Regions:
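Intracellular juxtamembrane helix-capping segments at the cytosolic ends
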Residues: 167-180
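C-terminal membrane-cytosol helix-exit motif in multi-pass small-molecule transporters
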Residues: 22, 27-48, 231-232
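Structural signature of the two symmetry-related core transmembrane helices
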Residues: 129-144
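A membrane-interface helix-boundary motif in multi-pass transporters
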Residues: 14-28, 207-226
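Helix-to-loop junctions at the C-terminal end of transmembrane segments
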Residues: 14, 114-126, 210-211
């Protein structure tokens, strides 16, 4: 979500210097940052295993897996926009490369802004209300993107979807860490594993389905998936 500005910078570097120089610069910067922060990493204190494992064992708690499914249902639509929105605008709406890239940047930008505001929003309203209203807004955004007839319509729709998707995963992760019948470490591990399966396994099937049925059908399906979160 913090990649909206680097998208433009990266595009400029690729255009000016080519992919190899771009990758070299990114690798050098990443290495420099890693080496600079390494001495300041806080060392883990040794904790006895008996203290680490508290509460019920994972297989005894159905709630934690239910939360994991919610995270999965939220991450798959996010993945569909991140990986395929630009392709959708290029192939279906005849957008230019710049406009297609902007659609993803707008999605990432609105998602970043409202994710930073997530704590304030959840403190003002309860988490369940935020979860349901956010999934509804995200579903409306993706459905509007599927029905768009112009690149700018889809760009605005993806921006709206970003607002809705922003706090779905954080709320799920927060719930995972606050379950009374399972330790925080175990709960977070289970939910993040289930949730990130969406980003790992979803891109290829989404692309395959899009080739068969078209991207509008894909984003309509993603909207329905978000609707499932609202009803849970």
């Amino acid at each position: 979500q913090t990649c909206a500005l680097p998208i433009f910078i990266g595009g400029y570097l690729v255009k000016q210097f080519g992919f190899l120089m771009h990758l070299f610069l990114i690798s050098a910067i990443s290495l420099a940052i890693t080496l600079s922060v390494y001495p300041h990493i806080i060392k883990d204190k040794s904790i006895k295993i008996k203290r680490l494992i508290k509460g019920k064992q994972p297989h005894r708690s159905c709630t934690i897996y239910f939360i994991g499914v919610i995270a999965l249902l939220a991450m798959i639509p996010e993945c569909a926009v991140v990986d395929w929105s630009s392709r959708y605008l290029l192939k279906n709406l005849n957008a230019t490369t710049e406009t297609a890239s902007l659609s993803f940047a707008c999605f990432a930008g609105t998602m970043a802004i409202f994710r930073f505001m997530g704590d304030f929003i959840r403190n003002r309203f309860n988490a369940i209300l935020v979860m349901r209203s956010s999934s509804l807004l995200a579903g409306i955004g993706l459905l509007a993107a599927a029905m768009a007839s112009h690149p700018w319509q889809a760009t605005v729709a993806f921006a709206i979807a970003g607002i809705g998707i922003a706090n779905l995963v954080p709320i799920a992760f927060s719930a995972a860490g606050n379950q009374p019948d399972i330790s925080t470490n175990t709960g977070m591990s289970i939910v993040t594993t289930i949730g990130y399966l969406g980003t790992l396994l979803a891109p290829a099937p989404i692309g395959l389905v899009a080739e068969i049925t078209g991207f509008p059908a894909v984003y309509t399906g993603m909207a329905a998936m978000l609707g499932m979160i609202m009803l849970l």
